[in-house]
Amino acid sequence: DVLPFQFGNMARTVSEYADEMVSAMEKTRKDVERHNMLINDGHYKAAANIREVYVTPELREEVPYINLSPMKNSVDRLLASGKAFDDAYKAMAALGYNMSKDDINKLDKLMYQIEAKLTRPEGLPRRPWYRHHIYAPGYYTGYGVKTLPGVREGIEEYKWDETEEQMVKLAEVLKAYCDQLDLA
């Protein structure tokens, strides 16, 4: 039998995660700008308790504009590949999976091995034992899941070079995933 895989929902979910990363970058940028403005304009000092020693918070590094194209392009391709597979699967099901046993076995092998395409042998920053680039436990959250963990944690930790590097790696794993999906 043909394994019952569908990829459209997964593609839409990953697209939502990517949109969250874009929003997180913008929110972080605005938060840093506001934080620095409050320091520079003396608002923190004005609100400080005069009975306690006041220590001015440190200014934060401005959030750079990171090239989001690798992630966005790979997600767009994932959406297209997922839809194409789901459409072909429905058409094949309507015809009763009229395929040779050998073709069914090849298709099934492609499908059950596809999840491995979302991993990289070097793993994630600071924890190489976690290799999945869509879902992984957070570095600081224990077993709480992080979506697109390399990119998300780079943003959360203000590590912009790492964020950009992880965005490229995410695009690479999504490309490999789509390449395998397109073979099916």
What are these regions (language model features)?
Residues 1-184:
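Secretory-pathway/membrane protein signature
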